[in-house]
Design a protein with these regions (language model features):
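Short acidic (Asp/Glu) and glycine-rich catalytic loops that position anionic groups and cofactors
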Residues: 1-2, 43-49, 149-153, 178-179, ...
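Hydrophobic alpha-helical scaffolding
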Residues: 12, 33, 37, 51-59, ...
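Alpha/beta enzyme core
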Residues: 106-259, 264-293, 298-308, 336, ...
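Long, distal/terminal scaffolding or interaction modules
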Residues: 313-314, 325, 338-342, 351-354, ...
Length: 658
């Protein structure tokens, strides 16, 4: 405690650097005994560690933070790199699972293992940017968790490619509430001018929690320009979001969390007074497990074993669970002392009570109008409901789930259901997949256990996060986000009324898919198979940006494609049937190359393509694929294979070693 008081003094008595430093606490209540203040265990529930992925930090650091937070009853955050399934259900499990733009490691089991699912729209330290995990940090374990190959640089896009509007965000929130109806869904925003309007939209999109992330967070791998100049203090964003939600009568529907440089109990109390109910710590927690701010997180050379995957450097890791537990215990103890001094029994009582703050008497402070930040609106200051329930309760699938539960519990006898479907029925098979994942994890059910034959135009996110053992046959058409995050099973879309040149699927299909098969007897929209890392698919045409950021899986396109093919693609392969002879011009050559495969050295690839087309014809009856198979020796000359640069000698070397 004496050591912590030294830290408190250094932080709380520092030069006026942050907005919160220009306010003192005041209260019109008499102090109370500390015994009357809520216990440490209640305060711990409001604490979490900020998102840091397995990959950005070492396995030892990641597991230490998770174990510590589970020990005290707080929450740790997995970050965006997936998590080892061996940790699920143990003290090493991260309660918060993050869904970021790269969708790395996002599987049905991953999503079901959480009590909170966090959609990371942006990071406070580098707002508006994506991310990269250098190939040097992609070890065999990291590659396995992220469904890619060791040594390959992994790129997270700047935006979520299934979120271009607040309605799109609402759809992703709905998807996540279907796969895990017991988890809160949080949306991480950065502190910026106008974040209040965004926060109101997020609440209307039925998020349960909003995170306001400040610019003072760590993110040791962020560009130096972003660290110095991008983002706003969390205080400004928190005040704006809190008041905008109150002004729109939405504050009672959502919880607000903040992060970005929180270090002491005084920081927590001031954050509560400004409107936050929960608090995340990143840099402080990392320092406790050994971080000494070398700022080489992106180089894999962290000398203390915290932010590296190098086995020799990881042996230098000295962090332990007890240090982290002690830190959060001391923070919570300081919070209790401040609450007792102010005359309040809980953090809940002071959330949003900005009358407990007064501007300091300081000449420098008088140059700014800090009083303006303390304006007050009437209404709820805290969340009043356990979940921000959507109007759509997905009764359609819940009724189907009742029919399927006996088979899910005892999959020895397969079941076939025939149903009508409409575009009102969103995220079809996602709720079913969640129940399968809860019982069997990613192993799912045996192939073909559940067959769902549906007629009509499906809603968005057909088969999102789908588990193994489910086959969906659609007689009609799909919509946007077909097979988003699917892990297994098969989706086949055909239409009696439409031919190969008709669109039977929308935009961003197979986004972040980790397995399974998608056959569409028609065209699909833009950003097809973006961040695909394991699914196999055949379609008959796409829009722009196909196979973007792809890291695994196989895509076969039997028709026209749009421009920017394979941008950011670092794994997997695509076969493209180029009848018009202009495909080569559409390839983004930065990371990939287009190769002809009509020679003997590519016989393995030709065999793979032929086998896929045979299965596709059997499932869809495609005339175009049938023509190719019947004339394979000549039609193979019209195919290009797109793969990461250098794949040709690699394949040749593999065959030589067989």
């Amino acid at each position: 405690w004496e050591d912590y008081k030294d830290v408190m003094h250094l932080v709380n008595k520092r030069d006026k650097k942050f907005i919160r430093d220009f306010y003192n606490l005041k209260s019109d209540r008499a102090s109370i005994k500390i015994d009357e203040v809520e216990p440490l265990s209640e305060i711990f529930k409001r604490f979490s560690t900020a998102a840091m992925s397995m990959g950005s930090i070492s396995q030892e650091a990641h597991e230490t933070l998770a174990t510590a937070m589970n020990t005290i009853g707080g929450k740790s955050n997995s970050g965006e790199g997936g998590e080892d399934p061996a940790r699920y259900g143990t003290e090493k499990n991260s309660s918060i699972k993050q869904v970021a733009s790269g969708r790395f490691g996002v599987t049905p089991e991953y999503l079901r293992s959480a009590t909170e699912l966090q959609i990371k729209v942006a990071q406070g330290a580098k707002p508006g940017e994506g991310g990269q995990l250098p190939g040097s940090k992609v070890s065999p374990l990291i590659a396995e968790l992220r469904f890619t190959k060791p040594g390959v640089t992994l790129i997270s896009p700047p935006p979520h490619h299934d979120i271009y509007s607040i309605e799109d965000l609402a759809q992703l929130i709905f998807d996540l509430k279907q796969i895990n109806p017991n988890a809160r869904v949080a949306v991480k925003l950065v502190s910026t001018a106008g974040v209040g309007t965004i926060a109101a939209g997020v609440a209307k999109a039925y998020a349960d929690k909003i995170i306001i992330s400040g610019a003072d967070g760590g993110t040791g791998a962020a560009p130096i320009g972003s660290i110095r100049f991008a983002g706003n203090p969390w205080e400004l964003g928190l005040i704006e979001a809190h008041n905008a939600l109150k002004a729109n009568n939405l504050r009672g529907q959502v919880t607000i969390e903040t992060d970005g440089g929180l270090k002491t109990g005084l920081d927590v109390v001031k954050a509560a007074i400004l409107g936050a109910e929960e608090y995340a710590f990143g840099t402080g927690a990392l320092v406790l497990v050994g971080c000494i701010m070398l700022r080489v997180c992106h180089l894999n050379t962290c000398g203390v074993g915290v932010a590296t995957q190098d086995e020799h450097l990881r042996k230098r890791f000295t962090g332990n669970v007890q240090k982290v537990v002690n830190y959060f215990t001391l923070i919570a103890t300081e919070v209790r002392e401040i609450l007792a001094e102010l005359g309040y029994k809980s953090l809940e009582e002071i959330v949003g009570k900005n009358e407990l703050l007064e501007v300091i008497d300081d000449e420098f402070a008088k140059k700014f109008n800090f009083e303006e930040l303390l304006y007050k609106l009437e209404g709820d200051n805290t969340c009043q409901v356990p979940f921000n329930e959507p109007y759509d309760q997905n009764e359609y699938e819940q009724e189907i789930l009742k029919e399927l539960m006996p088979t899910i519990k005892d999959p020895s006898t397969p079941i076939v259901l025939n149903k009508e479907i409409s575009n009102l029925n969103r995220s079809f098979a996602t709720r079913i997949s969640g129940e399968i994942a809860a019982l069997y994890g990613n192993a799912g059910l045996p192939d073909g256990t559940i067959t769902l034959n549906v007629k009509g135009i499906t809603g968005q996110s057909l088969g999102a996060f789908m588990s193994k053992g489910i086959n969906i046959n659609v007689g009609g058409a799909g919509n946007d986000y077909i097979g988003k995050g699917m892990n297994g099973g098969q989706i086949v879309i055909t239409s009696d009324k439409a031919g190969s040149d008709f669109a039977l699927g929308g935009n961003t299909c197979l986004y972040g898919a980790t397995g399974g098969t998608l056959y569409v007897h028609g065209q699909v929209g833009e950003r097809f198979a973006v961040r695909n890392s394991g699914a196999t698919t055949v379609v008959e045409g796409t829009g722009d940006h196909p196979c973007e950021y792809m890291t695994g899986g196989v895509a076969v396109i039997l028709g026209k494609t749009g421009v920017n093919f394979g941008a950011g693609m670092t794994g997997g392969k695509a076969f493209v049937y180029d009848v018009e002879g202009n495909f080569y011009e559409k390839v983004n050559p930065e990371l990939v190359e287009a190769l002809r495969i009509d020679t003997d050295e590519w016989d393995t690839e030709m065999f793979e393509l032929k086998a896929l087309l045979k299965d596709y014809v059997a499932k869809t009856g495609s005339k175009r694929a049938t023509h190719i198979l019947e004339n394979f020796r000549t039609e193979i000359r019209k195919f290009w294979m797109v793969a990461p640069r250098g794949v040709k000698p690699t394949i040749a070397a593999d065959k030589k070693g067989e």
